[in-house]
From Swiss-Prot:
Family statement: Belongs to the phosphohexose mutase family.
Domain of life: Bacteria
Alphabetized SUPFAM superfamilies for the sequence: Phosphoglucomutase, C-terminal domain, Phosphoglucomutase, first 3 domains
EC number per UniProt: 5.4.2.10
Organism of this sequence: Methylobacterium sp. (strain 4-46)
Keywords: Isomerase, Magnesium, Metal-binding, Phosphoprotein
GO cellular component assignments: cytosol
Function statement: Catalyzes the conversion of glucosamine-6-phosphate to glucosamine-1-phosphate.
Catalytic activity: alpha-D-glucosamine 1-phosphate = D-glucosamine 6-phosphate
Cofactor(s) for this UniProt protein: Mg(2+)
GO biological process: carbohydrate metabolic process; peptidoglycan biosynthetic process; UDP-N-acetylglucosamine biosynthetic process
Active-site residues annotated for this sequence: S100 (phosphoserine intermediate)
Protein name listed in UniProt: Phosphoglucosamine mutase
Gene name tied to this protein: glmM
Chain positions with Phosphoserine modification: S100
Length: 446
């Protein structure tokens, strides 16, 4: 049982769970663990736009420098940019301070190895062991402390990286693009990248104030984007989340395009271009059965993993896949990046749109998703899923669905929430079984 790390780093209420003391210890523990060889060790630190980012950044700097590591500060940058710059700047470790799509009150710490990949469970376990240890005797002497330096021009480096994922022959000229940056980490780089590629860009969610990240904007709140796309008759809307590792697209009609549909478009395009390294893609248990059926028609398979982009990526790396992701919009293209990258995923879709010279609605309507219902049940303590009444409700729901659908029950890895998802050909039945399980969970959690 892990004490600090969830499925996406350490996350919780800022100054409640994520305290300066914890951040200091994380810097010391990770700094000690990743000091290998005799060279001068360095860590790259980026963050999103939450007010608490200043506090956590400062504490991390103290932790890393106290064990002799030099710190390179990037300021507000997308998570995939931090991963990329960790590799590019030959750092021993990378850190992203973010709670992704969560509200500003939360924050988190994500760690990357020198290769830009998220840490394995084993490495995180070793860091947890050090977090609970007395490290005082392992701190550096006065002459061996690290230094901190703020790095300039990092935005331009990431913009150039993102642009290079498009073929040289492709421009975005003639496209009117609305991009919603969630008042988060991509508020500068996303609009600039799209503009440099030739698009007419209308940007929203680009005025962070420390409190408004993800508030009524971004990939988890796309209504503002939908309205703006319709109002301006834009060709496409692109919504990123707070740290820009996930994306949701809106077509010219204001219809939402989720991660499943994005993966379908890219999988078809890459199959035609013979770019897929395996005859299929990797997704999670939450991806729609319609995606699986569509890929089957193309002669491609769908491998499902546990929920979490880290598990998708682990399977991709172990089995040689170069395309995978989540319905929520984490799209991983290992030809380009070591983590989900919302901007790069959107650019790959725009590549297909420009090549085919068709509206986004036509390009993205690959399959009809099966009716799918997802509800969240919040609980305070205990294990509601172990209650007899809940077990009985789940068994009954699965029997009612039979072979005509799927039921997925899973606890969130980042918050005290249980997610209940069902899908099938009969929407009324799907709604009924989800409501039955949700009611049982609510009673058990009361």
């Amino acid at each position: 049982m892990r004490k600090y790390f969830g499925t996406d780093g350490i996350r919780g209420r800022a100054n409640g769970v994520i305290t300066p003391e914890l951040a200091l210890k994380v810097g010391q523990a990770a700094g000690l663990l990743f000091q290998r060889g005799d060279h001068r060790h360095r860590v790259v630190i980026g963050k999103d736009t939450r007010l608490s980012g200043y506090m956590i950044e400062t504490a991390l700097v103290a932790g890393f420098t106290s064990v002799g590591m030099d710190v390179l500060l990037l300021g507000p940058m997308p998570t995939p940019a931090v991963a990329m710059l960790t590799r590019s700047m030959r750092a021993d470790i990378g850190v992203m301070i973010s709670a992704s799509h969560n509200p500003y009150e939360d924050n988190g710490i994500k760690l990357f190895g020198p290769d830009g990949f998220k840490l394995s469970d084993e490495v995180e376990h070793e860091i947890e062991r050090l977090l609970d240890a007395d490290l005082q005797k392992r701190l550096s002497g006065s002459a061996d402390l690290g230094r901190a330096k703020r790095i300039e021009s990092v935005h331009a480096r990431y913009i150039e990286f993102a642009k290079r994922t498009l073929p040289r022959s492709i421009t975005l000229e003639g496209l009117r693009v609305v991009v919603d940056c969630a008042n988060g980490a991509a508020y500068r780089v996303a609009p600039e990248t799209l503009w440099e590629l030739g698009a007419e860009v209308i940007a929203i969610g680009t005025e962070p104030d420390g409190f408004n990240i993800n508030r009524d904007v971004g990939s988890t709140a796309p209504d503002a984007l939908v309205r703006k796309v319709r109002e301006l008759r834009a060709d496409i809307g692109i919504a990123l989340d707070g740290d820009a590792d996930r994306v949701l697209v809106v077509d010219e009609k204001g219809q939402r395009v989720d991660g499943d549909q994005l993966m379908a478009v890219v999988a078809r395009s890459w199959k035609e271009d013979q770019r897929l390294t395996q005859p299929g893609i990797v997704a999670t248990i939450m991806s729609n059965l319609g995606l699986e059926r569509y890929l089957g028609e193309l002669g491609l398979g769908l491998v499902r993993t546990a929920v979490g982009d880290r598990y998708v990526l682990e399977y991709m790396r172990e089995h040689g896949y170069n395309l995978g992701g989540e319905q929520s919009g984490h799209i991983i293209m290992s030809d380009y990046a070591t983590t989900g990258d919302g901007l790069v995923a959107a650019l790959q879709l725009l590549t297909v749109v420009q090549r085919q010279q068709r509206p986004v609605s036509e390009v993205c309507h690959c399959f009809d998703p099966l009716p799918q219902v997802l509800k969240n049940v919040r609980y305070r303590a205990g294990e509601p899923l172990r209650q007899d009444s809940v077990v009985t409700a789940i068994e009954g729901a699965r029997q009612r669905l039979g072979n005509a659908g799927r039921l997925v029950i899973r606890p969130s890895g980042t918050e005290p929430v249980i997610r209940v998802m069902a899908e099938g050909d009969n929407r009324d039945l799907v709604v009924e079984v989800v409501d039955e399980v949700v009611e049982a969970l609510r009673q058990a959690a009361a």
